[in-house]
């Protein structure tokens, strides 16, 4: 079973694969929201049309490049989870690090790359991991890290994630966001999205 909570989109396919997408438009306000919505909607339609994940990501990037005259750039964090094997593949395009929580242990997944829409030839950076029953994947947008008032922001966020005791994905995502907001006085300075996905054996 997969449990997800946050402002990302989850697509379930008939072959037992789950796709989770978190996108953050560059800038802020309505324009940034429109860019990230375009990315998520386009990827969903391409997957529903039968395109592979790799083809969908390339077509999405090309579409963003075409509209780049309007400076349309977005980060894309795209996770694919095989619900039979627990295999996780992350494709990052300019996206913030993601984290795997296994009990009290937290590991980081990061791949530096440009956001979607910059170069028609660019490709997402891929990484593979295997999730065990009880593990959580935590995906965030840049804003979650940027406003932590410490030198080692990534380490601080890892400590926050490790400190969450709930095994409910929704509670976990909210607790992480609430803790980060303590550093901003409760005000979201930028898009601050947290998505938590838990994996459990039936």
Regions found by a protein language model. Give the residues of each.
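Active-site-proximal, acidic helix/loop segment immediately C-terminal to a metal-coordinating Asp/Glu
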Residues: 27-49, 131, 135-186
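A short acidic-Thr-Gly-centered motif at the start of a beta-strand
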Residues: 11-15, 79-83, 128-130
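DG-centered beta-turn motif at the end of beta-strands
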Residues: 24, 95, 140-143, 191
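Short hydrophobic/glycine-rich mini-motifs in sensory/regulatory modules
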Residues: 14-20, 133-136, 190
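Catalytic core of PPM/PP2C metal-dependent serine/threonine phosphatase domains
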Residues: 33-103, 177, 181-192, 196-197
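Cytosolic ligand/metal-binding cores
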Residues: 18, 22-23, 30
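PP2C/PPM-type serine/threonine phosphatase catalytic core
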Residues: 89-127, 131-133, 138-139, 146, ...
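Single conserved hydrophobic/aromatic residue that forms the stacking wall/gate
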Residues: 1-7, 11
């Amino acid at each position: 079973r997969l449990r997800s909570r946050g402002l990302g989109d989850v697509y379930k396919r008939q072959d037992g694969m789950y796709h989770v997408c978190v996108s953050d438009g560059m800038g802020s306000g309505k324009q940034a929201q429109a860019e990230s919505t375009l990315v998520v909607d386009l990827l969903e339609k391409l997957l529903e049309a039968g395109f592979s994940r790799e083809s969908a990501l390339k077509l999405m990037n090309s579409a963003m490049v075409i509209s780049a005259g309007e400076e349309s750039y977005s980060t894309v964090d795209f996770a694919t989870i095989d619900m039979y094997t627990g295999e996780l593949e992350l494709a990052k395009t300019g996206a913030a690090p993601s984290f795997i929580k296994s009990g009290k242990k937290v590991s980081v997944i990061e791949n530096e790359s440009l956001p979607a829409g910059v170069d028609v030839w660019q490709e997402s950076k891929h990484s593979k991991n295997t999730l065990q029953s009880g593990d959580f994947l935590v995906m965030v947008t840049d804003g979650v890290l940027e406003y932590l008032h410490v030198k080692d922001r990534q380490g601080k966020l890892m400590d926050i994630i490790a400190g969450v005791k709930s095994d409910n994905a929704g509670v976990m995502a909210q607790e992480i966001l609430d803790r980060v907001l303590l550093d901003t006085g409760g005000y979201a300075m930028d898009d601050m999205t947290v998505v938590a996905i838990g994996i459990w054996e039936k």
